[in-house]
């Protein structure tokens, strides 16, 4: 009888030990990212998963006109949802983007002005993106959501300006730790109704592996610089904006899932706004931009 009880205890002990070994093996079998291993990076989560993001965009402008400071800060707070749609293209994704919420305001020495965003909250539009993010397009440009802030506060703002931050261009070939790739693209800068064109040259470097919000990510650090050019005729005068911009970003790409989890960008620019006409003017201008984007549940 004693031998039988001892035998049962031994069987239980062995079973527990085997269970522990299985658990340890299972936990250890989840392959972690290796900084020295090559990974092929592609945007692909949108095929099977909705992704929601919170983005905060801040733009500070410092300028002086006829001896009077005209400083302003514009703040945009977004929540938007990416949903995959059926696409005939194997190398691109068709996404529906829903603007779930947006708060927009401008702060000056005279106080704070909030912009009416009710007409675009909850609205959607489509976007096509290539697997590497090198091409972004809009099948129905007339669907794009615009926020009219008035000529002096920033003009009509097309919301595609924030989306590029979600899709930095990925390298065509697999990358491993320390490797660099480059990207060139255009976007508009917010400054009154001028909204000058920014021609950006960016350099991306894979610098580390890191877990962010539960995802195993490649950490990428980027630097970029740009020439800024814009012109417009207003009130019988021709206005031009010429300047330079430089900035840096940190972004985290979930390799297995195929999407950017988090982005943080800082930029500074300097330029000159000139006008022609009976009373020509030359106004120096400086701007600081910060962008923070992260996925939310």
Can you annotate each of these PLM segments?
Residues 3-16:
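Bacterial N-terminal signal peptides that target proteins for export
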Residues 27-297:
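Signature of exported/secreted
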Residues 15-23:
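Bacterial N-terminal signal peptides
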């Amino acid at each position: 009888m004693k031998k039988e009880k001892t035998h049962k205890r031994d069987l239980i002990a062995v079973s527990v030990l085997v269970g522990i070994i299985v658990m340890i093996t299972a936990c250890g079998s989840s392959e972690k990212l290796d900084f020295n291993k090559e990974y092929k990076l592609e945007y692909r989560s949108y095929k099977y998963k909705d992704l929601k993001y919170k983005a905060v965009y801040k733009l500070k402008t410092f300028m002086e006109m006829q001896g009077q400071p005209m400083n302003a800060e514009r703040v945009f707070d977004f929540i938007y949802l990416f949903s995959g749609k059926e696409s005939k293209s194997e190398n691109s994704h068709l996404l529906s983007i829903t603007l779930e919420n947006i708060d927009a305001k401008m702060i000056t020495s005279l106080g704070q002005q909030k912009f009416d965003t009710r007409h675009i909250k909850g609205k959607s539009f489509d976007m096509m993106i290539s697997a590497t993010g090198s091409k972004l397009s809009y099948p129905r440009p007339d669907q794009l959501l615009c926020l009219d802030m008035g000529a002096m506060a920033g003009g009509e703002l097309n919301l595609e300006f924030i989306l590029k931050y979600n899709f930095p261009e990925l390298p065509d070939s697999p990358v491993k730790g320390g490797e660099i790739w480059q990207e060139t693209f255009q976007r508009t800068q917010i400054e009154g109704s001028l909204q000058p064109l920014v021609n950006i040259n960016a350099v991306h470097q894979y610098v580390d592996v890191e877990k962010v919000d539960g995802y195993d990510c490649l950490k990428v650090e980027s630097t970029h610089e740009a020439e800024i050019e814009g012109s417009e005729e207003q009130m019988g005068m021709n206005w031009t904006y010429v300047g330079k911009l430089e900035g840096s970003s940190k972004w985290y790409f979930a390799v297995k899932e195929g999407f950017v989890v988090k982005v943080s960008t800082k930029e500074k620019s300097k330029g000159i706004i000139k006008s022609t006409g009976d009373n020509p003017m030359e106004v120096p201008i400086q701007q600081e931009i910060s962008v923070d984007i992260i996925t939310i549940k």
